[in-house]
Amino acid sequence: DRTVSRGLGDVYKRQDADWVIEAVVERIDIKHKLYSQIDKVRSPDSIISSNTSTIPLSILTQEMSDTMKADFCITHFFNPVRFMRLLEIVETPTMNKDKMSGLRDFCQNELGKGIVNCNDTPGFIGNRIGVYAMQVAMYEALERGLPVEIADALFGRPLGIPKTGVFGLYDLIGIDLMKDVLASFKKELQENDPFMDVVKPHPLVEKLLEKGFNGNKGPGGFYQTTIVDGDEHVKAMNTSDMSYYDFDKVDLEI
């Protein structure tokens, strides 16, 4: 009945939590350290899950106790969680079946999620396809010199994708987080995987990160939002010199 935990301090305070969801950055060293701390204080009746979007369960559970492994799974909620119905679940062969059944029932009937059961592979289903598509679209758009707002209009509603497109979605997710996501894919995928052709962050992304531009949560990214006379004003980035400019809504005749 209450939303629990934005930090480990809250976990210590809520040792009676029925379900603890880990949602830290996509770095396995940080996750392993957090799991070790959670295992010391959690209720033996609790379920622990990760909101990872890319890291396989076999990697997440490498340093876990057997008891925690039996209570651990992946619950990948899609962003924004309050609107997106999709929920990917990956479970271990040793996961407590009664707890897993209860978790599925809660997610479907109380949270209103549509559950997709996934194999334990990098990126599961959604991000294995989606992140690859984003990377290909980004590389193609930048290579062809497409303005970001034009690229997003093309890689958006016409393809049945949210209007954020690729560059807007990068800003929404966080450019720094996307770099961690790509690093995770690079570590786990085989060298002959087609994803490896586009898994490296684009040089423009590296330049943005060097300037501290992480997307919506920072001073800007491929778009920059400012407040003008109390109203939000969005500018697009010129990818050739990283300056920002005003733009009109793109209306494609498709």
Where are these regions (language model features)?
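Loop/helix-junction capping segments adjacent to catalytic residues or to phosphate/diphosphate-binding pockets
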Residues: V11, I28-D29, K97, P219
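Rossmann-fold NAD(P) dinucleotide-binding segment
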Residues: K13-D66, A70-D71
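Rossmann-fold dinucleotide-binding core
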Residues: I47-R128, K163, G230, Y245-D248, ...
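Generic detector of well-ordered alpha-helical packing
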Residues: R2, A23, T52, F77-P80, ...
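Substrate-binding/catalytic subdomain of NAD(P)-dependent oxidoreductase enzymes
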Residues: V90, V116-I254
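Single conserved hydrophobic/aromatic residue that forms the stacking wall/gate
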Residues: D1-Y12
